[in-house]
Amino acid sequence: MGDKANTHPGAAGRATAADHPASVRNVVLVGHSGSGKTTLVEALALTAGAVNRAGRVEDGGTVSDYDDIEHRQQRSVQLSLVPVEWDGIKINLLDTPGYADFVGELRAGLRAADAALFVVSASDGVDGSTRMVWDECAAVGMPRAIVVTHLEAARADFEEMTRICAEAFGADDPDAVLPLYLPLHGPQAPDGHAPVTGLTGLLSRKLFDYASGERKESDPGEDELPGIEEARNRLIEGIIAESEDETLMDRYLGGEQIDVKTLIEDLERAVARGTFFPVLAAAPAAEGARQGIGTVELLELVTRGFPTPLEREAPRVTTVDGEPRTLDLCDPDGPLVAEVVKTASDPYVGRVSLVRVFSGTLRPDQTVHVSGHGLTDRGHEDHDVDERVGALSAPFGKQQRALTHCIAGDLACVAKLSRAETGDTLSAKDDPLLMEPWQMPDPLLPLAIQAHSKADEDKLSQGLSRLVAEDPTMRLEQNQGTHQVVLWCLGEAHADVALERLRSRYGVQVDVVPHKVSLRETFAARSTGRGRHVKQSGGHGQFAICEIEVEPLPGGSGIEFVDKVVGGAVPRQFIPSVEKGVRAQAAKGVAAGHPLVDVRVTLLDGKAHSVDSSDAAFQTAGALALREAATDARIHLLEPVAEVSVLVGDEYVGAVMSDLSGRRGRVLGTEQTSGGRTLVRAEVPEIEIGRYAVDLRSLSHGTARFHRAYARHEPMPAQVAERIRQQEQDG
């Protein structure tokens, strides 16, 4: 594994369609923004012969960062597939954004992959978000390896970074996180930094020198061997500890020299099972070089150590009616089950869907059943519809190469599935099936928007609908209380990209306006009101008088209407008219224009005219009576309160609780969870947590998560209510 003498780059270069699941590896790259994932993909593509030269992120020339937004921001904002071929194996490299706002793209990559490469910068280390993703992979048993990048940095220390990785990723078993290679350093520069020029293979005791631009293998000198023996022995012990051969440890402890072939085979099996996590090193190719440092070794690990799709547990599948269905593992001849990992709208070819096939074989012009269930609350309506597949293609960044088929275990792009959304299931039209939906984080940053002009209004709805269909981490809300269009996002960068795509893809200019919460009004004490609507200036007139009493009710009671009229002062047929007028006025509000709630309105008395009284007249009188009752009453402004649950590392619990208190929150309690984390439960006014998604990330260095849910409305403090009223008056 990476210790072979063969240095020949994959002759096939760019991969096309696979013919058997055993010849496919689906690998997602995970790491924080700036860790070097995109640069590593570029180096692997160069070594595999898929590109003639490696592009640079700074120049906008990389294969996987091809979007204009990515070029401007110089960071990935979307999932990108770069398939390459090495030693007859098709490797689907899934490059994901490292910034937390684009975790939906990461989730899509994890769903499509069978193994993960965690990319760690030698100069920056492991951040909390990367640890959290590691734990998620561990929970589902996904095989993982670690690649240390930025070895060219002046302060890069591979051995120290290996120790940090073992501490961060190997809490349960640090001896399962060990390097397979050590960096080979060139002559020391005047500044004291010795650049990395190659690698030393621990198992093979071979040197792999990349100084010439291509990998050259040699034997170390006798004086160099002692420097690697300690690391080699620890690696051997780590491999043996994870071996399924229970006699191997006894033989090793008994003094037997275990042959390298046996060790490599056991290492490969342990990696594929997800019980051993090798650490490798990589650096981009120098100008004019054909191979980056460590790229051959990494490609060897992927092809020989990472599992095939045949080794992945079959996904949970049901009929569209919810009946469980058992599938054979990744059978190209089985019933079609594929998942839309990602959708995107192209201005020239329409909607394009990246699909992972889990069973069966997908072909162009095939009619499939598209099922989408489970995200109705985010604007994704349930749908079951038959559609014809357009062209199939293998993406290579923004380029597409036509395919004749896509078998179980492989990925492809599908054109012209107009109804398919991210997370949907594709199956045979005569045997519709549904995959269990994947979990996505809740979008918790509200972005209130409105069309910039009349011309933009017609396009806004369509543009927003398409954005939400592509990205299930967005949620579209038409707030009936505030009459605002709200796009819920994961963070500010997520929101910025959404606005840019509205403009560039759909030609929609929008204005961002302050987000409002749904306030309510209520009476603080009992009050009475008289509504008089009399117009009798000749001809058919209008006459209605009613007297009401309004009293407060407990929160959540709504509007209660009671008739206590005696003696027919208000004719029976007009009492519903009074109630209708009262409820209509309550919906408009009686003080600041917010709906009135939680009151009992009692109709006490009134007067009518045999000719001039009417339904409309008593509706008007009812509304006037409620408004008069409000003029002499104390009206409380009610604000929505949210139940907030924050899962945070123990070291940040104090800061989180203090911050919640500063937002007028009430901490209800804490609960210790696994992994040194605490669940903090609180109730906080919604008006105080509009930007909490951004603020919490800063407070916890990206390691905390939170959930919010509406609890109730309750009276707003007088000084806050006055500030809100003043803001509303100022526009």
Regions found by a protein language model. Name each.
Residues 1-731:
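Structural and coupling elements of P-loop NTPases
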